[in-house]
Amino acid sequence: IGDIWSGIQG
């Protein structure tokens, strides 16, 4: 996804 939780590429 690339949100706060998963960082950039999560």
UniProtKB/Swiss-Prot annotation:
Q: Which domain of life is it from?
A: Eukaryota
Where in the body, by tissue, does this protein show up? Expressed by the venom gland.
Query: GO cellular component terms?
Result: extracellular region
- What keywords does the record list, in alphabetical order? Secreted
Principal localization reads: secreted
Q: Where in the cell is it found?
A: Secreted
Keyword field contains Transmembrane: no
Give the protein name, as stated in the record.
Venom peptide 3
Identify the species of origin: Brotheas amazonicus (Scorpion)
